[in-house]
Amino acid sequence: KDQAFISKLDGTIALFGAAAKGCVYLNALGSWKLSNTYCVDDTVQKQGKFIPGTEIQVRTRDYLMVDKPDNIIIMAHNFAPTIAQSLINDGYKGRLITMLPEIQIDRA
């Protein structure tokens, strides 16, 4: 269900939050890969590394704001409202998507 939803998204996709629950979720999607996708995390120690078990690199928020993806999937669903508001405050204008516990789409 989640793979089908993500594959139908129009435009570019970035992930936000390289916490353990997001990593487990991405790996649970199986062999399916988000091609040309990156993850953003504000934790400096995670930046420049890859999410375990994937080819998804963790980048900075500055990279995200320059790239301006059409969709941001917020992986840390328990912090989604705070993350969404901070992205809006930073000037993000695309779709904000939370996949867990169920799919929710908001427009920035």
Model regions: which residues?
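Hydrophobic, well-ordered beta-alpha structural blocks that scaffold small-molecule cofactor pockets
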Residues: 1-108
